[in-house]
């Protein structure tokens, strides 16, 4: 969590997302989209894009341990109380926000990382002699890809819904690294 930037009327800017995290996020989005829509699963390009995704996930895991505070997993590990508080605020239409990841956002991050690890592992397994042509590996890969696609759609919908609810342009924050928070929004830890 960086220092607040100069104030604008009714808004306060906070530097949150570091360049690596933003580059990771958008690179992962592009590569996932490429493999889901544009590459043929039987082609070498699909395999190499999958390796690139696996490498990005490995880097993110390291960055989650050694990166700046807002990137560290320990800084946004959700508790049942924080999840309940966020859901209560949402149900009561209270404007609140988190400078870093919200508890529900953190759950989605962990879900996507775990799912992409599973996709990468099963994808790699399908390239080996030991698992080539084994039906359960292929089926698990397909199930995980479908789950990832559902999760990505839910993530995008939640980002736009939360942006509208809180008045914070979350896509802009992930592009610039700066969250512009309305002064009327309560910031939760």
Describe the residue ranges of each PLM region:
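Membrane-embedded alpha-helical bundles that constitute the cytochrome b-like, heme-associated redox core
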Residues: 1-189
């Amino acid at each position: 969590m960086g220092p607040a930037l100069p104030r604008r009327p009714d808004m306060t800017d906070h530097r949150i997302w570091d360049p690596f995290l933003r580059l990771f996020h958008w690179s992962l989005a592009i590569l996932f989209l490429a493999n889901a829509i544009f590459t043929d699963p039987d082609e070498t390009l699909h395999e190499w894009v999958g390796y690139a995704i696996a490498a990005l996930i490995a880097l993110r895991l390291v960055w989650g341990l050694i990166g700046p505070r807002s990137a560290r997993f320990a800084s946004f590990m959700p508790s049942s109380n924080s999840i309940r508080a966020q859901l209560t605020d949402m149900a009561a239409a209270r404007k609140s926000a988190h400078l870093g990841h919200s508890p529900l956002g953190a759950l989605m991050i962990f879900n996507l990382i775990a799912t992409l690890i599973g996709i990468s592992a099963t994808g790699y397994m399908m390239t080996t002699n030991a698992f080539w042509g084994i039906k359960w590996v292929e089926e698990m890969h397909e199930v995980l890809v479908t789950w990832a696609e559902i999760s990505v759609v839910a993530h995008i919908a939640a980002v736009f819904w939360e942006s509208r609810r809180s008045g914070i342009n979350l896509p802009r924050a992930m592009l610039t690294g700066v969250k512009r928070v309305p002064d009327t929004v309560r910031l939760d830890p």
